């Protein structure tokens, strides 16, 4: 029988099929010391894993590279990689393709979190004294989050429901991945230069894994929040999720919806606040009045004693004192009336139906969706015009866009 002679390509292909086709080399963990760490411009990361006896080449593709960079992995650190063995035919080299990474010892995410918290605390970034108050009567609110998903919808819906007059400006950004920290920091800086001037910034995202939320623990993002001249509300994830952004922001919200509620005041809350202030003013008025009455009675008693003891004491003009007291009371009442009128005028501005009294109308589709652009209507579409005293049903005959 003639001996089989293999070409180099054939034997390499046999090796490849044997290694990559075997379940034994899939879904395995390899632990070793990091060496030859290279961050390729393509986004892939190449390195080696070694111990006292051997070395193996390893790589992690761009899609999973953040799992390594988030851990601040450096050469000499011991890590555990999860993945599979591969065989590269052109060079005849066996490599380990990692899809996940964990760091041994002090390098895991939780310890990095705790060390970074100590660092920002020492810098004074978490001090309550440096945090700015939140204006709940904000006119302009900026949202720094992704432009898709439940978080942005919840934010806009809640803000508009509670405070219809508010202006909302979205600064869309990546919220996870290797470059997300730079994107978020840049958007915070852009928002601080934006015109009209913003009253509040809400920075955050919806829920995700601990690793998904890690961007909001990055120093680049934390520094941008601290440097913001606009008050920042941190709204990352769900109730149990805590990030370092929560520590440095001016206010922490458990969820994006909660952030919208903290950034606004509803009509019901406003009326309660007005009632509370009114009751305080009445209480103050009564206290002033009662104190003045006590002073008058005490004054009368003292002067009666003087008159009884000294017959030559001239009568005091109590009418003058009473007139002065009445003038003081009238001044207090006038100030309270001006305060209440001012509050009532601000409350009227929050009424979404007020513009209808001036001849404006609200355009709605048949399914009661508000139409605010010609792009949202079609020819022959039935629509409703809501006026202050009723509704008009009509049909679109033509559409003309401004500037065209």
Curated annotation (Swiss-Prot):
One of its GO terms (cellular component) is exodeoxyribonuclease VII complex. The keyword Cytoplasm applies. Its EC number is 3.1.11.6. It is found in: Cytoplasm. Its main location: cytoplasm. Keywords: Cytoplasm, Exonuclease, Hydrolase, Nuclease. Pfam families: Exonuc_VII_L, tRNA_anti_2. One of its GO terms (biological process) is DNA catabolic process. It catalyses: Exonucleolytic cleavage in either 5'- to 3'- or 3'- to 5'-direction to yield nucleoside 5'-phosphates. InterPro entries: Exonuc_VII_L, Exonuc_VII_lsu_C, OB-fold_nuc-bd_dom. It comes from the Bacteria. One of its GO terms (molecular function) is exodeoxyribonuclease VII activity. Heterooligomer composed of large and small subunits. Bidirectionally degrades single-stranded DNA into large acid-insoluble oligonucleotides, which are then degraded further into small acid-soluble oligonucleotides. HAMAP family: Exonuc_7_L (MF_00378). Belongs to the XseA family. PANTHER family: EXODEOXYRIBONUCLEASE 7 LARGE SUBUNIT. This is Exodeoxyribonuclease 7 large subunit.
């Amino acid at each position: 029988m003639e001996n089989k002679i293999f070409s180099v390509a054939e034997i390499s292909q046999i090796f490849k099929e044997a290694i990559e086709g075997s379940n034994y080399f899939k879904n395995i963990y390899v632990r070793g010391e990091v060496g030859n760490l290279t961050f390729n411009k393509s986004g892939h990361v190449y390195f080696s894993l070694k111990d006292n006896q051997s070395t193996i080449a390893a790589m992690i593709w761009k899609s999973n590279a953040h799992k390594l960079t988030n851990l601040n992995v450096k050469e000499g650190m011991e890590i555990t990689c999860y993945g599979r063995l591969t065989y590269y035919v052109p060079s005849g080299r066996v490599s380990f393709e990692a899809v996940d990474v964990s760091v041994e010892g002090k390098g895991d995410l939780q310890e990095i979190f705790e060390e970074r918290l100590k660092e920002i605390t020492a810098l004074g970034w978490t001090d309550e004294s440096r945090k700015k108050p939140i204006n709940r009567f904000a006119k302009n609110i900026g949202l720094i989050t992704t432009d898709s998903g439940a978080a942005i919808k919840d934010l806009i819906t809640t803000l508009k429901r509670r405070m219809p007059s508010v202006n909302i400006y979205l600064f869309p950004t990546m919220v996870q991945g290797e470059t997300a920290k730079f994107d978020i920091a840049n958007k915070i800086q852009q928002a601080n230069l934006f015109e009209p001037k913003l009253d509040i910034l809400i920075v955050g995202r919806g829920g995700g894994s601990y690793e998904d939320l890690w961007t909001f623990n990055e120093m680049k993002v934390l520094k941008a929040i601290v440097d913001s001249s606009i008050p920042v509300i941190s709204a990352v994830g769900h109730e149990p999720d805590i990030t370092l952004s929560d520590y440095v922001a001016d206010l922490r919200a458990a969820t994006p919806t909660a952030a919208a509620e903290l950034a606004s005041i509803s009509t019901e809350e406003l009326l309660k606040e007005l009632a509370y202030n009114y009751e305080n003013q009445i209480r103050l008025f009564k206290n002033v009045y009662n104190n003045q009455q006590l002073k008058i009675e005490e004054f009368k008693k003292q002067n009666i004693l003087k008159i009884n003891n000294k017959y030559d004491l001239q009568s005091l003009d109590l009418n003058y004192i009473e007139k002065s007291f009445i003038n003081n009371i009238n001044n207090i009442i006038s100030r309270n009336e001006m305060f209440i009128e001012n509050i009532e005028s601000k409350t009227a501005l929050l009424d979404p139906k007020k513009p209808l009294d001036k001849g404006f109308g609200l355009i709605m589709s048949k399914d009661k969706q508000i139409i605010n652009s010609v792009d949202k209507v079609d020819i022959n579409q039935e629509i409703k015009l809501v006026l202050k005293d009723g509704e008009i049903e009509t049909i679109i005959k033509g559409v003309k866009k401004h500037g065209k």
